């Protein structure tokens, strides 16, 4: 299920503002990601192969998990109109088929003169952090609002 769109502008942001997305990782998600990217490493696609690895079973692509951060940034915090500038990623643990990943994005710093927000990003499975990092995004001001984004996202939630 896709997250509902929410449009936030730079003026709406404050340090500590947080958004959370939860996603159960399915085999079809992993296969689809492999097809789209061409990363057909058998650790993601073959249970037989993966059983002989230290993980013991198939795991999701690390960048698939990281892509869930992009889902939050593009749809909820800050949402449509935000432009990704950079992202750091630390892969801490594997994500397995059937795991429920909780993605947490939190505003860590606002840089008003450039309309940028630094965001702390964490992906967890249960109590275990599987991925963390930091994103830098450029956020539009209200006066730059795109009427289409407003209609799609319904404005500020």
From Swiss-Prot:
Disruption phenotype: Cells lacking this gene lose the ability to grow on C1 (methanol and methylamine) and C2 (ethanol and ethylamine) compounds. The keyword Lyase applies. It is an enzyme of class 4 (lyase). It comes from the Bacteria. The gene is croR. GO terms for molecular function: (3R)-hydroxyacyl-[acyl-carrier-protein] dehydratase activity; 3-hydroxyacyl-CoA dehydratase activity; fatty acid synthase activity. This is 3-hydroxybutyryl-CoA dehydratase. Residues 22-120 form the MaoC-like domain. It comes from Methylorubrum extorquens (strain ATCC 14718 / DSM 1338 / JCM 2805 / NCIMB 9133 / AM1) (Methylobacterium extorquens). Gene3D superfamilies: Hotdog Thioesterase. Transmembrane segments: none annotated. InterPro entries: Fatty_acid_synthase, HotDog_dom_sf, MaoC-like_dom, UPF0336/Enoyl-CoA_hydratase. GO terms for biological process: fatty acid biosynthetic process; glyoxylate metabolic process. Involved in the regeneration of glyoxylate from a molecule of acetyl-CoA. Keywords: Lyase. GO terms for cellular component: fatty acid synthase complex. It catalyses: (3R)-3-hydroxybutanoyl-CoA = (2E)-butenoyl-CoA + H2O. Its EC number is 4.2.1.55.
């Amino acid at each position: 299920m896709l997250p509902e769109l929410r449009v936030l502008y730079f003026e709406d942001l404050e340090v500590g503002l947080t958004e959370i997305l939860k996603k159960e990782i399915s085999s079809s998600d992993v296969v689809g990601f492999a097809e789209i990217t061409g990363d057909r490493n058998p650790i993601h696609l073959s249970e037989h192969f993966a059983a002989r690895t230290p993980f013991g079973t198939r795991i999701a692509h690390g960048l698939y998990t990281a892509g869930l951060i992009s889902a939050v940034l593009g749809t909820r915090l800050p949402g449509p109109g935000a432009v990704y500038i950079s992202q750091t990623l630390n892969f801490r643990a594997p994500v397995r088929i059937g795991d429920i990943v909780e993605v947490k994005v939190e505003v860590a710093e606002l840089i008003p003169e450039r309309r940028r927000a630094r965001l702390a990003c964490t992906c967890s499975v249960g109590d275990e952090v599987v991925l963390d990092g930091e994103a830098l995004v450029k956020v539009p001001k209200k006066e730059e609002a795109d009427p289409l984004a407003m209609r799609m996202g319904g404005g500020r939630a």
